[in-house]
Design a protein with these regions (language model features):
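ABC transporter nucleotide-binding domain
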Residues: 178-274
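Catalytic Walker B motif of ABC-type/P-loop ATPase nucleotide-binding domains
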Residues: 159-162
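Conserved ABC ATPase "signature" region
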Residues: 101, 105, 112-130
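Conserved catalytic motifs of ABC-family nucleotide-binding domains
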Residues: 155
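Conserved ABC transporter NBD signature motif
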Residues: 61-72, 77
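Conserved ABC ATPase signature
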Residues: 134-138
Length: 340
């Protein structure tokens, strides 16, 4: 990664009548960087990718890719980018090679160059031995690798990956993450990833923009984001309570020191709190409801903790499922309503 800015976004906004899907976001992405947009479904991540990939026009604001404006120079922008959407675009009845020949022909790539490129890409994702097999017989992980190299046929400088590990089993997710890192390392491809998966953001991204309610509410490296809640004033604790009940949870949430509370299972609470008296306050609250504390552990912060700390709620699969886990985030009360 170097200091050359490839993507520059300034006050980008997308509205549908009175509904704001992307609300005046600004960020830049440097050449060779893997940049992540992290947040729940409905936060505005995919809409942002649609704007940057010229599939939708912004209501306000500007963005450039490789120096080209996404509205005025949309044709030039499209020559620079590759898009991997959440939906896999492949024809099951065609072989891997036939699929790539078809999609490569849409870019008007000369046949001899396309044939060589297909062989190189199949080798890159370790699918050479399956080049003559029908894609309909592939595992989900293999299909996702095919989906990615389809977007690489035109040798893009910039890749947009929308939820690249969504729906994959753990092993396939690892394979896709390793491939993304290899692509970035060997080709210096600039990559923007949207995800609600903490592990993807943590393991892949050089910098992360946390999105919530159509806004970017924090932007930094994973390490620096975690430092937001790793100071002397903040405590992250895990409690095992043998007789955990709704009354006990509400009593803990009512403590003035509490920033966020998550119930992990039938006996465990994960708590973010502030102040010197945090431990004592939580223990007193549990015991006041006759709770039986079996264990108490001090934890290191995760990106999930950062999201809770900033927004006051968890990252959920759907914006409709967001459940406030405390009275407010440490960065102030959050706007009402849901981004769809």
């Amino acid at each position: 990664m170097d200091n050359e800015v490839v993507i520059d976004v300034q006050n980008l906004t997308k509205s549908f009548n009175d509904f704001v899907a992307v609300d005046s976001i600004s960020f830049d992405v440097k050449k060779g960087e893997i940049f992540g947009l992290l947040g729940p479904n409905g936060a505005g991540k995919s809409t942002t990718l649609r704007l940057l990939s010229t599939l939708s026009k912004p209501t306000k604001g500007t963005a450039t890719i490789g120096g080209y404006d996404i509205v005025k120079d949309d044709t030039e922008v499209r020559k620079l980018i590759g898009i991997v959407s959440e939906k896999m675009i492949m024809y099951d009845r065609l072989t891997a090679r036939e699929n790539l020949i078809f999609f490569g022909s849409l870019f008007n790539i000369p046949k001899d160059i396309l044939a060589k490129r297909i062989n190189e890409l199949l080798e890159l994702v370790q699918l050479t031995n399956w080049k003559n097999a029908k894609v309909g017989t592939f595992s989900t992980g293999m299909r996702q690798r095919m989906n990615v190299i389809r977007a690489l046929l035109n040798m893009p400088q910039v890749m947009f990956l929308d939820e690249p590990t969504l729906g994959l089993d753990p092993q396939s997710s690892v394979e896709i993450r390793e491939f993304i890192k290899k692509l970035n390392r060997e080709n210096r491809t600039t990559i923007i990833i949207t995800t609600h998966m903490m592990v993807d953001a943590d393991l892949l991204c050089d910098r992360i923009g946390i999105m919530d309610h159509a806004k970017i509410v924090a932007l930094d490296t994973s390490t620096n984001l975690k430092k937001l809640i790793s100071g002397a004033d903040t405590t992250i604790m895990k409690l095992e309570i043998g007789n955990l009940s709704p009354d006990i949870i509400e009593a803990v949430r009512a403590c003035k020191c509490i920033d966020a509370v998550t119930q992990e299972n039938s006996t465990h609470l994960r708590i973010i709190a502030h102040g010197d008296e945090a431990f004592d306050s939580v223990i007193d609250a549990v015991r006041a409801k006759e709770g039986k504390i079996n264990s108490m552990e001090n934890l290191q912060p995760t990106l999930e903790d950062v999201f809770l700390h900033i927004t006051g709620h968890e990252v959920r699969d759907s914006a409709d499922q967001k459940i406030p886990m405390a009275r407010h985030g440490r960065f102030g009360s959050q706007p009402q309503g849901r981004i769809r």
